[in-house]
Regions:
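Structural motif corresponding to the C-terminal cap of alpha-helices
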Residues: 164, 203, 339-343
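Fe-S ferredoxin-like electron-transfer domains
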Residues: 50-195, 208-223, 227
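Terminal leader/tail segments of proteins
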Residues: 1-3
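Mobile "lid/hinge" segments at catalytic clefts and subdomain interfaces of large enzymes
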Residues: 167, 200, 388-392
Length: 584
């Protein structure tokens, strides 16, 4: 059926757009940029900030273009004197309630409010509040909130409520006393936050940021008694370049490795290698449950945001989750056991740093359930992509001009299956590549499972295997995870294997990834561009199934025994428990 179109005029230019489009979308298609602040497409469409106002012929007042629908014959004006003065006054009033320490703010190079001030010609703030003190709340291990920089756009509350259905933050009080916080102004550490960090990447200012752990890493690098090992997650190599202005989806693996060496890390390993171990362990666990009558569906445990959601909001499903540690934790476990043994080092002298797309990893590294038999915690510090970007900049490295380097081979060889872990469906596809081949025989299984790829919130597929049908599901974003969980509970959804990721689109869209301007987010499929880069990497890999990785084979032969062995369970598995929820 043909889509119905609507014709209108914008600044006297004829424009034709699909029915249901907003004035903002129509203007964009015609080459007119309408500034906005509170608008995030499909997430926060409330027209509250009034920055995006335009004139519509016949309307009594200016209208918010982000929510105002087009109509046949409409005449719109986006740059009249009335519009410009309204936007400037609105922005001045917003700035009057904003602590402007722009020189030292964590968002000083990519603040939407700062950019708006320049774009709208604000050369003086007539109503500045020069004495506004910081309002810091830093109780959680992953996030710092400073409400003195909050502009009440409600983008953070919308993503927490709608995308994640966690809803731990919202507006408190009324009028001039309105502020964003938790119920009864509780600290974030006291409520049911899952640490996903989606609120941070939604925030247009410096009101929300990850807790910066770079000082701890620099201290370790400067400590001659510490042997400092680093490992980046699969998605980092296709997002780090954005910190330096490279196009979205640029793979910078080689430059990233060189940068890490020049920062002073003693060994640069790859968490992709640990992802291959994850598939061997999780695949073995799945086959054991499938063939031995264990609890199904088996649900993946790679996403700490999802795991925390499970423990707080769905503890009745704890028996379904895999006991495997995440790739980050497996990486640290192998470094402080296998690598320490091979290098003849005391594990206590090894300082492990992970580079992750995820703020929830900062919470995960603190979990006592992860502690190794030798008394060590697997990972000492988890940094986000953004933190690594800042370290590279502060070290004076010209990232774009760095030569390509290679990972240290002992724990630095990986497969295409590990590379795609960073995209929603990647863990499932990686597992299927190994599990299906084990069930059907070498050379009989397909290499790609495109049914589980893509940015849809929920994906389903079934595969006919010898003697059984395997039904799988992939869901990302906790709103979609909740839907699938409800279906599993009531029996309307029947699966054998399920992949859950807390962040929409998976790790490529994690809360620790580079923050893109709302104009980019609203009109570009960032998740798809980043994921496509991972699939391109997969296609070019020598090994594309996790069990083909020669490093994995060697570590099992020389150290772990076999997948699912007693030693593997002691080092690469853990338990998850019901967590206390704050009740209001």
């Amino acid at each position: 059926m043909d889509e119905k179109m609507v014709s209108l005029r914008i600044n006297d230019i004829p424009v034709t757009v699909p029915e249901g489009s907003t004035v903002l979308e129509a203007a964009r298609s015609a080459g007119f940029n309408i500034p906005s602040l509170c608008f995030l497409k499909d997430i926060n469409e409330i027209g509250a900030c009034r920055i995006c106002v335009v004139e519509v012929k016949g309307a009594k007042s200016l209208v918010a273009s982000c929510v105002y629908p087009v109509a046949e014959g409409m005449e719109v004006y986006t740059n009249t004197e009335r519009v410009r003065k309204s936007r400037q006054l609105t922005l001045e009033l917003i700035l009057s309630n904003h602590r402007m320490d722009c020189l030292t703010c964590s968002r000083n190079s990519h603040c939407e409010l700062l950019q708006l001030a320049g774009d709208l010609g604000i050369d003086a703030v007539r109503y500045a509040n020069d004495n506004m003190p910081p309002q810091i709340e830093a109780s959680a291990p992953h996030l710092v909130r400073d409400n003195s920089k909050c502009v009440l756009c409600r983008r953070c509350t919308a993503v927490c409520r709608k995308t994640q259905e966690v809803g731990v933050i919202g507006p408190n009080d009324r009028g001039f006393h309105t502020h964003i916080g938790c119920a009864f102004d509780r600290d974030l550490a006291e409520v049911d936050c899952v640490s996903c960090g989606q609120c941070i990447v939604a925030c247009p200012t410096g009101a929300l940021s990850e807790k910066d752990d770079t000082a701890r890493v620099l201290a370790a690098l400067n400590d001659p008694a510490k042997h400092v090992v680093v490992g980046p997650a699969p998605s980092i190599r296709v997002t780090l370049g954005e910190c330096f202005g490279l196009p979205i989806g640029t793979n910078v693996e080689g430059k990233m490795v060189t940068a890490l060496r020049r920062l002073g890390f003693d060994k640069v390993f790859d968490v992709d290698t640990a992802a291959d171990f994850t598939i061997l362990e999780e695949g073995t666990e799945f086959l054991s449950r499938l063939n031995g009558g264990g609890t199904l569906p088996l649900i993946t445990s790679c996403s700490p945001g999802w795991v925390r959601y499970l423990e707080q909001h769905a503890p009745d499903m704890l028996h379904n989750i895999s006991s495997c540690k995440s790739p980050q934790q497996m990486f640290g476990s192998l470094v402080k056991t296998y690598y320490a043994e091979q290098a003849g080092m005391d594990p206590q002298d090894i300082f492990v740093v992970s580079i992750m797309p995820c703020t929830a990893k900062k919470y995960e590294v603190l979990r006592e359930e992860q502690r190794l038999p030798n008394g060590c915690m697997p990972v000492d510090v988890s940094l986000t992509t953004r933190e690594l970007g800042r370290m590279i900049t502060q070290a004076g490295l010209l990232f774009e001009h760095l030569p390509d380097g290679a990972f240290d081979p002992m724990l630095g060889v990986s497969t295409g299956a590990a590379a795609i872990f960073g995209a929603s469906g990647g863990v499932m596809e990686a597992a299927l590549r190994t599990v299906v081949e084990q069930l059907t025989g070498a050379g009989m299984a397909p290499l790609e499972y495109k049914e589980v790829r893509g940015m849809e919130g929920v994906k389903e597929a079934s595969y006919e295997l010898p003697g059984k049908t395997v039904r799988v599901c992939v869901a990302s974003g906790l709103h979609n995870v909740k839907r699938v969980l409800d279906g599993i509970r009531d029996g309307s959804l029947q699966y054998d294997f399920v992949e859950f990721m807390a962040c929409p689109g998976g790790c490529i869209n994690g809360g620790g990834q580079p923050i893109q301007h709302a104009n980019v987010r609203n009109f570009t499929d960032i998740k798809a561009l980043r994921a496509a880069a991972l699939y391109r990497q997969d296609e070019g890999m020598t090994y594309r199934r996790s069990h083909e990785n020669p490093v994995v084979q060697k570590v099992y032969a020389d150290f772990l025994g076999e997948p699912g062995s007693h030693k593997a369970h002691a080092l690469l598995h853990c338990s998850y428990i019901k967590q206390k929820r704050y009740r209001v």
